[in-house]
């Protein structure tokens, strides 16, 4: 690796870190321990807990021991709460954080149509966006995709490729992707480097603290 490449990577890592630090409380709010009470309220998890209680009662384990097992947070997180449930709850929580932030922007007046989880007629997307902000006078829109992480593989990586590396933004429509996770240190000019480098350069990949400035810049709001 050349010195120039190393400098580019170091610069990007600092940029990611500086942006993430401003949003660290959001990431903490999406932690398993923070969301635990919401996890165990999910019907699928309640069924697992009830089934476990039933099976344990058929053994010589006492009621007190059963209660202690069920109340063991670490045990439940590892064995009773599926990754899919965690992902769904965490995703919904992240969506709500972003929704509340957008609705708090008083500068988005009656000229703006703000919608959540609806298709935007201005720009066709493969999936329903998490939100869009449409200036009805200018007929310009920001279309938002919320993704806690873009580097976890599978669906996350595909989304990154679609909305960052192959972004279809134009003069009238801008597609952006909001994230929450702090990625592992980037050590080479790999796909993760390309995602963050292009995303930051074009203001299409961002943490929540940058959303207000990007909206104002795009719609030229003073």
Segment roles from a protein language model:
Residues 80-88, 114-121, 146-154:
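Surface-exposed cleft-lining segments at the edges of enzyme active sites
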Residues 126-127, 132-143:
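Active-site beta-strand-loop-beta-strand hairpin of nuclease catalytic cores
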Residues 78-107:
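Solvent-exposed, charged helical/coil patches
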Residues 1-73, 81:
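Nuclease-adjacent, charged terminal/linker segments that flank catalytic cores
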Residues 179-222:
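Domain-level recognition of nuclease-like catalytic cores that cleave nucleotide substrates
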Residues 103-124:
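A short acidic/basic microdomain associated with nuclease active sites
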Residues 104-109, 168-175, 196-210:
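Structural alpha-beta junctions
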Residues 147-195:
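Catalytic cores of nucleic-acid endonucleases
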